[in-house]
């Protein structure tokens, strides 16, 4: 009986050790991909899934296409890409991928599997020659390019013309700076021009309408906006260097969803994406936050030393939800993390390497009274 009693204590101890670890990760288990798996570089600025199902990762040193098994790299050194520092990715209606870099814009042709420099001149005789901050598109097939040192460029595939927007005659931005630009499902353009307000345009930037009164009390004055994301119930979600905000566009109110971490420091929100209508994922400099809009519950996931299933790095720069319901997360130091769509309700239970455990093998299970 003494042997059975000791065995029971051993099993309880092992499972206690396992479940303490499982609780730290809130039941979320990620698969990591980095340079050891074939990724060109561990800093991932941009992610997209193309129409064929391939995943694309824009890194600090090359563009990678992933088929679920292996990577194909497009790099300057191999002659398949003109510049390696990728800043933004966008797939147009024809399946071409527009690639923003720190020195201009490139276009990938899925038919020929080649990348070409976009060298067209605009109506002001300016080309896209500097850092591209953002590439996106409208519902009419137009391509919009936000640059760091130049104005906004609009490319019309129907007319094959490039036009400068929001610029003076020299092609420079006619106001301070432009941050985020996003077209919603109604083809309304939302943007941030770094003056504390948000704006929208229903005529492709011919006119900009402020969301809030321009009375000196704009809610984002002094803030640096990193991400704009329209959501359900006529709300806009704004990621800033001091947290995550929800803007109710109906009554023009702002609600703070995330502001301080457990140490009291500001939460630097770089990226936000919807996992579902009720669940918002925020990539920050201090880990991944999952905010439930219905319950207002927050889950904070961080890298855990010795845990191969935790996120590989706390600095999150990009998030993409694929068509299968999985989430791909790009980090600054740890490559890509993948969280598959959950079809079962089983929790992953495993030991931590740094804990002095009495055993790692489970021989049998026994149901409790619940």
Residue ranges and their predicted role:
Residues 1-370:
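Carboxylate-rich, polar loop motifs that coordinate divalent cations or form catalytic acidic clusters
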């Amino acid at each position: 009986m003494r042997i059975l009693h000791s065995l029971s204590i051993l099993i309880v101890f092992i499972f206690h050790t396992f479940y303490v670890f499982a609780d730290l990760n809130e039941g979320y288990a990620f698969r990591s991909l980095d340079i050891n798996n074939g990724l060109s570089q561990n800093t991932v600025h941009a992610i997209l899934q193309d129409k064929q199902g391939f995943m694309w990762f824009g890194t600090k040193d090359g563009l990678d296409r992933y088929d679920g098994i292996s990577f194909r790299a497009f790099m300057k050194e191999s002659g398949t890409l003109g510049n390696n520092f990728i800043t933004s990715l966008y797939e147009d209606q024809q399946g071409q991928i527009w690639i923003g870099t720190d020195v201009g814009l490139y276009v990938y042709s899925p038919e020929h599997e080649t990348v070409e420099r976009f060298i067209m001149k605009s109506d002001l005789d300016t080309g896209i020659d500097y850092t591209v901050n953002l590439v996106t598109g409208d519902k009419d097939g137009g391509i919009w390019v936000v640059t760091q040192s130049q104005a906004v460029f609009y490319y019309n595939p129907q007319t094959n013309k490039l036009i400068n927007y929001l610029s003076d005659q020299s092609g420079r931005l006619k106001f301070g700076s432009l941050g985020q630009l996003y077209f919603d499902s109604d083809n309304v353009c939302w943007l941030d021009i770094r003056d504390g307000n948000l704006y929208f345009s229903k005529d492709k930037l011919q006119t900009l309408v402020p969301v809030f009164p321009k009375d000196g009390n704009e809610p984002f004055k002094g803030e640096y906006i990193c991400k704009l994301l329209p959501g359900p119930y006529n709300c806009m979600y704004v990621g800033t260097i001091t947290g995550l905000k929800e803007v109710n566009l109906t009554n023009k109110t702002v609600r703070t969803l995330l502001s301080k971490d457990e140490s009291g420091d500001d939460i630097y929100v770089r990226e936000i994406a919807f996992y579902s209508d009720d669940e918002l994922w925020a990539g920050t400099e201090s880990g991944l936050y999952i905010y439930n809009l219905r319950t207002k519950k927050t889950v904070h996931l961080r890298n855990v030393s010795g845990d191969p299933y935790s996120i590989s790095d706390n600095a999150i720069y990009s998030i993409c939800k694929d068509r299968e319901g999985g989430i791909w997360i790009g980090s600054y130091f740890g490559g890509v993390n993948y969280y598959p769509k959950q079809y079962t309700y089983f929790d992953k239970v495993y030991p931590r390497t740094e804990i002095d455990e009495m055993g790692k093998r489970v021989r049998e299970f026994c149901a409790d009274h619940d």
